[in-house]
Amino acid sequence: MQKRAIYPGTFDPITNGHIDIVTRATQMFDHVILAIAASPSKKPMFTLEERVELAQQATAHLGNVEVVGFSDLMANFARNQHATVLIRGLRAVADFEYEMQLAHMNRHLMPELESVFLMPSKEWSFISSSLVKEVARHQGDVTHFLPENVHQALMAKLA
């Protein structure tokens, strides 16, 4: 039986840190679903459709990644996708407490759903989509932190 994992997030936009995590996850699992949350309460810069398209382009080189948008409760989405592993990236100790709460709640809602925490490579450990957008808004160079297609889309949004 295939081991299916979900890597959820808002990915507004997807960064090289996210690509690092999903790439490493593809080496651990047969099928990785990059699940892009609608997250209307976060007021994303990119629409869900744009985020899905950008992520599909940025992960096209990874054969066992499927990019999908979702707005469901994570445990229900995982169950519907027949996934038993939830991948979460941890950048710093500060991320851990919140992620632990989410993991416990997801486990309560779906006991067979296991959370796996991956640390990004050192090079990406300090970046977030929010930080990249903030730097870009102030004309800072963010080319190193984003896939090329995402960088172009971000610059177009900010123009």
Swiss-Prot record:
One of its GO terms (cellular component) is cytoplasm. One of its GO terms (biological process) is coenzyme A biosynthetic process. It is found in: Cytoplasm. Pathway: Cofactor biosynthesis; coenzyme A biosynthesis; CoA from (R)-pantothenate: step 4/5. Its cofactor is Mg(2+). Its main location: cytoplasm. GO terms for molecular function: ATP binding; pantetheine-phosphate adenylyltransferase activity. Substrate binds at T10, K42, M74, R88. It catalyses: (R)-4'-phosphopantetheine + ATP + H(+) = 3'-dephospho-CoA + diphosphate. Homohexamer. This is Phosphopantetheine adenylyltransferase.
